[in-house]
């Protein structure tokens, strides 16, 4: 239920107006208390999707009609939020979120950060990310729809494969931890009115989550792991999130979960890529979140199918996890 106000600023010189600037603003509070998030003093649950600014006609170029359609689809399906995965969206898109009352997790283009590089290159990358945070916050700080800053999506620890294999969550290396902590602290220093987060891949060290305000977890139990075993998938999800919550006592948003689906592909029994499996997959995650108090949000991956690299995993060069095709 958005309420926007027109703020006008006048520059005068000897009683003459020589310039004006007009900005639509909204007034709201967002804060984290314990393992809950509060909007205007009331608990809020994040219900929505990860998105891409993409059109089948114009690709990743800005397309305002496509943005309007996306926001209409979000409203129609009952969503209240989305993440700008995995880069800043156009300011026109954020203005649409303001006007429609969506909550936006705003993310810099730090996707799949790797740290197995020489120090000089890592330092260059860090300065670039710091500049991106500064630029993004300065651009979007006056948008009421923006309620959280995300400093990275799925950074990779050096020993990620071993962590995913044995399920152990030991301390991370010092280089990557310092890198991410620097970005988190920068965001908090520039804007202390919004929570700061990062979207964590399976196997992320808990060290990386110590300084975030809200924990975002990208989890694909039932798709990349425990395929066709949704009972086992939810059990693994529940066990992992329970351990993370016990050690952090922070609100958790499942920021990605999904199953690729080919339109029109059906099966009576569980079968990957069928519409039935995708629906059951989503249903299980929703049921788990509903009964888990510290899971304060779900963002399905993804709002609509999108173009990606050609591979044996990507039928037709598309990611087919979209709720819409």
Each model region followed by its residue ranges:
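A short acidic, helix-capping loop that chelates divalent metal ions and anchors anionic groups
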Residues: 53-58, 113-117, 157-160, 224-225, ...
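Substrate-binding clefts and catalytic carboxylate motifs of secreted carbohydrate-active enzymes
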Residues: 145-150, 159, 166-190, 196-198, ...
